[in-house]
Amino acid sequence: YQHGKTETLPFRSGPKPKKEEHRLILLAEDEQGRILMRKRSERLLHNLWEYVNLPVQPTQQALDALGLQMLEQREIGKAQHVFTHIIWHMQGVYAKVQNAPVPEDYEWVPKEEIETKALPTALSVFTKWGRKNLWNQ
């Protein structure tokens, strides 16, 4: 008050910019029609089920890392989800893969069981695509 700064104090800096991540969401289906999923253990979306969710990379590279052999691939589309402190820019890909052992931390989930899993809203675009094109045909 005494320095004439009542209009500028207290100084509030704006909110921190949100961290942005580019993610590959992979709906991997084996020859038995099961979808590869895992239950998240990270703090973000803890205990919710998700499809393969990796930093953006070529699909074949992602499958190689999981020990899976691709038979066919289709682009699903892109989506974005804004969390309180992070933004996911997601690129969805469907891949038909040969039957293979389950990669560590993942499960092959029969299509009829997917709707019984707790899935994050962030992946709803890809769940809708799967519902329309894979498990409700």
Positions of predicted regions on the chain:
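Intrinsically disordered, low-complexity, charged terminal extensions of DNA damage-control enzymes
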Residues: 1-137
